[in-house]
């Protein structure tokens, strides 16, 4: 049996051997601020490397080699060339990340290092966060406007506040750049009458003004019956270079989407039947509509060679609407399928915030040092309207034909009305420092304190509740540069998670504090042969405490004494091979479990100690191989593997493991014209991408599909 610390002595010994083999050449890593002139250039089209700056892992603009944490980055062109339609598909190709989204969470939930959902795996857009409500995030919409996606694995509350125990995903959009105006038009068409029209335009308007504009419209008939979907995304930014050391950037991003409204196929006698793959059991007048608008004003000021200031003022809104029949249950006794769970829900959310940081270079005890000090403040207003307690007209469910389900219409015995509104006020102060202890050794530290006040007004009984929460988090990491292109690191960090989405905590949840987590991690990173080979290895141990659990002596009582932990290994590799071959591969292993957790079952407290949390695969792996054929043609193919996962806390229902193959082809037919072909699920594998209704429904992955694109530059 693997010990709680993953046989840490062996891990450390292995890392030390790797370190010694890399050599001990002096590798000075002096901390330098950006030059005094702030310039904007076109984004690099090359892949990300270990010497590239990663913003998700630190506010100090450190490279991956300098960061004492497991980080990775996906280039936007790389994402689009592989046919990844959304952030979740793209980021699931990075080490240890699994997409587990359902319509109830906006289709965006992720699993990382044994922790799942919006409350533990945070998603940022351009470094900013919209606080999730009812476990839902619906921005960004697609991958067209993405410059890159950065991933920081492990606790990150010291950087971004509560809700970041498993990982942080930072989606960075394309930015304005200086130079001649460049335009890029894409037309796409594929299986299920899928269509795309997209535009990317940017460049200089004057010596001081530059811009970036992205538009993308998608629509499809979908691969299930009545599975129509459509979305429109806009991303625009205007950058003003007021002086050599002062810039202002005004940006607005907006998405309007109506996703394929799909809650999966029911299990028949506990088994999946392949003939039901394209069935849709939802109602005729179903609704799933998201409208998100983000406006941001960023000010960057190079005050001196040693001091910079950055401020971001933002206004974010999200309006979401669902109206569906979500549950489909098979009765083994009567051999009948019933439809129930008629839910009508609306979210109205508004967030105003500001983040101010100062970065300065200084001396600390005679040692070169760099620090970031900052604060952020947010006010979030949220209103929930629904038909709770969700009583169906037919409590036993409506019988429907499993092969030819009649759509029917929405019906509920519970009226649709406003349930509550809340105002959440958040303030945090934070700091981060990197000090060069020697030519090879550096220490990175960070602290953060969050204050949160939640005021909830129930609109049906005119009651009011309020809760104040405080989160304290810190980290410390050591990085030893073995050579200029290799480093070994160790770090300890903490995080806090809410017992639910903070802005929508119910009165019962408001009685409890934040859950707390801590992580120990060691790792190794190395680039060889002029960056033709880059590889990383990380091992970690995470413990999360203060989970809500049923009192073993009184099943009607909830206590905050539960505990969950995970141990894991992650490895990644990028290899440039002879003859224009390129290989990218990664693999992850995690052993996640409940250490102390009781669940109430029919009024009885049942221990789930030792069970695996829901939606957590033990193993994941990804591989992608590219080949350049001459100067005009590139082909690529890849595999995605996800291990089996449990669908319920009792670990009685299981989703099987799957391996899916994808492929791509691009041909530069003319100087300014490129034709592309993407094939998803090449071998038409039928698999459960996620689950709903505690595993009674499988949300299937997309069948084999082909998509052709024409890209024109002018």
Give residue spans per PLM region.
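Short acidic/polar hinge/loop motifs at secondary-structure boundaries
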Residues: 128-153
């Amino acid at each position: 049996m693997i010990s709680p610390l993953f046989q840490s002595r062996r891990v450390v010994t292995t890392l030390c051997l790797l370190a010694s083999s890399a050599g001990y050449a002096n590798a000075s890593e002096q901390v330098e601020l950006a030059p005094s002139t702030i310039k904007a250039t076109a984004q690099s089209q090359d892949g990300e490397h270990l010497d590239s700056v990663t913003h998700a892992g630190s506010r100090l603009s450190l490279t991956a080699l300098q960061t004492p944490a497991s980080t990775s980055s996906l280039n936007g062109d790389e994402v689009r060339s592989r046919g990844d339609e959304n952030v979740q598909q793209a980021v699931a190709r990075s080490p240890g990340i699994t997409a587990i989204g359902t319509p109830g969470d906006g289709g965006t939930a992720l699993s990382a290092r044994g922790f799942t959902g919006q409350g533990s795996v945070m998603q940022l857009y351009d470094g900013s966060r919209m606080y999730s409500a009812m476990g839902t995030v619906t921005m960004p919409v697609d991958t067209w406007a993405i410059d890159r996606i950065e991933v920081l694995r492990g606790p990150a509350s010291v950087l971004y506040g509560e809700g970041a125990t498993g990982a942080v995903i930072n989606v960075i959009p394309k930015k304005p750049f200086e130079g001649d105006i460049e335009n890029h038009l894409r037309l796409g068409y594929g299986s299920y009458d899928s269509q795309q029209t997209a535009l990317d335009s940017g460049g200089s308007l004057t010596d001081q003004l530059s811009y970036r504009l992205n538009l993308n419209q998608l629509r499809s008939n979908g691969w299930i019956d009545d599975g129509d979907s459509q979305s429109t995304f806009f991303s625009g930014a205007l950058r003003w270079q007021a002086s050599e050391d002062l810039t202002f950037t005004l940006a607005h991003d907006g998405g309007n989407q109506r996703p394929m409204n799909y809650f999966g196929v029911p299990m028949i006698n506990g088994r999946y039947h392949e003939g039901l793959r394209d069935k849709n059991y939802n109602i005729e007048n179903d609704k799933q509509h998201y409208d998100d608008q983000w406006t941001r004003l960023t000010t960057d000021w190079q005050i001196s060679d040693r001091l910079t200031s950055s401020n971001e003022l933002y206004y974010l809104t999200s309006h979401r609407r669902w109206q569906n029949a979500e549950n489909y249950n098979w009765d083994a006794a009567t051999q009948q399928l019933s439809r129930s769970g008629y839910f009508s829900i609306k979210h109205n959310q508004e967030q105003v915030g500001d983040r101010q940081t100062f970065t300065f270079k200084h001396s600390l005890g005679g040692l070169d040092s760099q620090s970031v000090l900052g604060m952020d403040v947010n006010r979030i207003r949220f209103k929930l309207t629904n038909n709770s307690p969700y009583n169906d007209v037919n409590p036993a469910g409506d019988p429907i034909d499993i092969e030819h389900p009649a759509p029917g219409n929405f019906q509920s015995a519970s009226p649709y009305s406003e349930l509550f509104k809340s105002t959440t006020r958040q303030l945090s102060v934070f700091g981060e420092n990197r000090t060069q202890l020697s030519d090879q050794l550096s220490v990175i530290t960070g602290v953060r304190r969050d204050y949160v006040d939640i005021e909830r007004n129930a609109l049906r009984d005119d009651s009011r509740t309020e809760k104040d929460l405080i989160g304290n988090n810190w980290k410390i990491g050591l990085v030893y540069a073995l050579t200029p292109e290799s480093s070994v690191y160790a770090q300890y960090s903490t995080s806090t998670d809410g017992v639910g989405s903070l802005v929508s905590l119910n009165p019962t949840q408001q009685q409890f504090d934040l859950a707390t987590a801590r992580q120990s991690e060691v790792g190794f990173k190395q680039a060889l042969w002029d960056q033709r080979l880059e590889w990383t290895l990380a091992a970690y141990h995470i413990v999360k405490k203060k989970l809500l659990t049923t009192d073993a002596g009184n099943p009607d009582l909830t206590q905050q004494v539960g505990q969950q932990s995970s141990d894991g290994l992650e490895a990644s590799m990028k290899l440039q091979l002879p003859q224009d071959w390129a290989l990218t591969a990664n693999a992850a292993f995690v052993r996640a479990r409940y250490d102390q957790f009781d669940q109430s079952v029919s009024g009885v407290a049942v221990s789930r100690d030792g069970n695996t949390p829901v939606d957590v695969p033990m193993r994941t792996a990804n591989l992608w191989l590219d080949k350049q054929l001459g100067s005009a043609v590139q082909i690529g193919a890849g595999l995605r593997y996800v291990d089996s996962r449990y669908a319920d806390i009792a670990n009685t229902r299981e989703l099987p493991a799957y391996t899916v193959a994808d492929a791509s082809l691009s041909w530069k037919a003319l100087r300014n014209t490129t034709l592309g072909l993407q094939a998803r699920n090449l071998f038409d594998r039928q698999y459960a991408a996620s689950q709903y209704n505690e595993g009674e429904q499988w949300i299937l992955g997309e069948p084999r599909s082909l998509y052709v694109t024409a890209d024109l530059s002018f």
